[in-house]
C-alpha cells in the first residue's frame, strides 16, 4: 500500500480491518511528513493540485514492489473509462504512458527541485520498461471485466467486510476518498480553477444512472461545491502558504471559459 500520509481515522480502520479479514501479508510505504508538506506546495504550482505525491506514489510504488518480488500480474480498480467521456472498446492498460498522462502528470525528475531531492522521490519513480518487461508485469483494470457499479460494490464491502463510510468534504457521497482527510482541498482547488468540483462530477453520474433527478443534482451542487473545506487550514499551516497566495495560484491556472470566473 502506498500511504499518502493524509489518512483519516476511518481510512485507517478500513485498511487494517480489510487486512485482518483477508488474512494477507502487507507492505506499506509512508513518505515523511516533511516531504509531504513540501511536495503539497510544489504540486500546486507544478500540476495545479495538491496531490502529486498521491498520484505518483499510488502508481509507482506497486510497480516497484512487483519488479522487486517478481510479481507479473497487478489488478487495479477502475480505469479512466469509467468516468470520462471517451469510449474504450479495448481494455485500458496501466503502463508508463498511462502513469504519466493520467496519474502523475509529472515524473519524479520533473518534481525534483531545490526543496525536494531526487533521493527523497525514489519510491515515486516508475520502473524502466526493461525492468517491467523482464518480470513480465501486466496491469489490468477490474472495471474492464465487470460492470463497475460503485454503489453496489460499497454495499457489498460494507455487508461482508465491515467497511465504514464517513462524511467527506467536497462531496455528498460518504465513501468517495473516505480514507483521505485532505481530499476536500484537492476538490476546492478544482472549484476555484474551474467553477465546479466533485459534487458536480458525482451528481452528473448519479443523474445519468437514474439515482436522482437533474433538479436534485443542481440543489446538491449549489450546496456542496462552493463550500470551503476545513482541511484547507491544515494545508495552509503545513505548506506555509497564506490563503491569499493559495487562491491567487489557483486562479492563475484558469483556462478557457474559466478565465471569466470572478
Model-predicted segments: where are they?
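Nucleotide-activated chemistry modules centered on ATP-dependent adenylation/adenylyltransferase
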Residues: 1-262
Amino acid at each position: 500500500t502506498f500511504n499518502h500520509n493524509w489518512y483519516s481515522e476511518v481510512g485507517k480502520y478500513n485498511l487494517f480491518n480489510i487486512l485482518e479479514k483477508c488474512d494477507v501479508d502487507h507492505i506499506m510505504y509512508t513518505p515523511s511528513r516533511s516531504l509531504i508538506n513540501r511536495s503539497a506546495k510544489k504540486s500546486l504550482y507544478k500540476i495545479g493540485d495538491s496531490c502529486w505525491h498521491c498520484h505518483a506514489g499510488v502508481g509507482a510504488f506497486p510497480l516497484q514492489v512487483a519488479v522487486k518480488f517478481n510479481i507479473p500480474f497487478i489488478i487495479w480498480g477502475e480505469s479512466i473509462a469509467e468516468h470520462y467521456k471517451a469510449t474504450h472498446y479495448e481494455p485500458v492498460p496501466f503502463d508508463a504512458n498511462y502513469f504519466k498522462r493520467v496519474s502523475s502528470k509529472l515524473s519524479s525528475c520533473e518534481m525534483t527541485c531545490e526543496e525536494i531531492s531526487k533521493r527523497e522521490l525514489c519510491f515515486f519513480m516508475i520502473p524502466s520498461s526493461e525492468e517491467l518487461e523482464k518480470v513480465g508485469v501486466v496491469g489490468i483494470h477490474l472495471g474492464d471485466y465487470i460492470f463497475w457499479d460503485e454503489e453496489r460494490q460499497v454495499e457489498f464491502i460494507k455487508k461482508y467486510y465491515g467497511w465504514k463510510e464517513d462524511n467527506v468534504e467536497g462531496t455528498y457521497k460518504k465513501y468517495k476518498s473516505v480514507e483521505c482527510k485532505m481530499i476536500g482541498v484537492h476538490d476546492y482547488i478544482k472549484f476555484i480553477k474551474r467553477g465546479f468540483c466533485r459534487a458536480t462530477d458525482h451528481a452528473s453520474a448519479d443523474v445519468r444512472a437514474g439515482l436522482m433527478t437533474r433538479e436534485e443534482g443542481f440543489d446538491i451542487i449549489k450546496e456542496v461545491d462552493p463550500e470551503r473545506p476545513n482541511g484547507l487550514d491544515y494545508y495552509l499551516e503545513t505548506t506555509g502558504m497564506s490563503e491569499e497566495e493559495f487562491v491567487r495560484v489557483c486562479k492563475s491556472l484558469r483556462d478557457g471559459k474559466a478565465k471569466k470566473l470572478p
